[in-house]
Amino acid sequence: MSDSKLAGQFFDAAIGLLTRVRDEESDSIAAAGAAVADTVASGGRLFAFGAGHSSLAAQDVVYRAGGLALMNLLTVPGAVGVDVMPATLGSALERVDGLASAVLDSSPATAGDLLVIVSLSGRNALPVEMAQNARALGLKVIGLTSVAYAENTRSRHASGGFLRDHCDIVLDSKIAIGDAELTAPGVEAPFAPASTVVTSAIMQAMLAAAVEQLVARGIEPPMLRSGNVDGGHEWNGRVMTEYRDRIFYRH
């Protein structure tokens, strides 16, 4: 069986995007890593949020083998979309004004903490208001988004602003509008989205930069090990006990 031409093209597209992000966003990723390290060093808590498929990159850094134990998932019931029926409910919730405020008010997030918001378009009410309200509460906000949307589409928030307009640090995923890398004869719509690959890589790169910063400051990063290696559960238990006041996925 011959190799798939389109499969190879997708890999090329994803690698190209990752290379571009590495080359063009290195300063921003380093700044985001430093902000995470600052929060860890000062006793703050870390949170990640994403709606729809953007939630995948947020989920990937929570309770993760090889990840920072202090990263907590900020959730909005139904906003992931694929976990509810109909799945389109998730898209609708992203456009509801006031929802972000209710979520933050009922969360443990407080001044001095840090929130990473992942939103590909950054144009809907939920991520925009999440950033606005988080900063008003005194959180440091990192936005992971595609700046192309802010430059080429209209905001769906009453303010006319995008996620990038309300963040302390912006990480640009470089994903094209529509999030589909390939076209082919006989296929009426573009296909093969790469946003999950790229945004997850950016999140991991940011945390790697944070680990580097912590070590440089003489602080041992609170890391988790895989539960599928010998001693992993015991290691994680010790870490979670030591940092139990900053870890909320165990409560």
From Swiss-Prot:
Residues 36-221 form the SIS domain. PROSITE patterns: SIS. InterPro entries: RpiR-like_SIS, SIS_dom, SIS_dom_sf, SIS_GmhA/DiaA_subfam, UPF0309. GO terms for biological process: carbohydrate derivative metabolic process. It comes from the Bacteria. It holds the Pfam family SIS_2. GO terms for molecular function: carbohydrate derivative binding. Belongs to the UPF0309 family. HAMAP family: UPF0309 (MF_01240). This is UPF0309 protein SGR_3073.
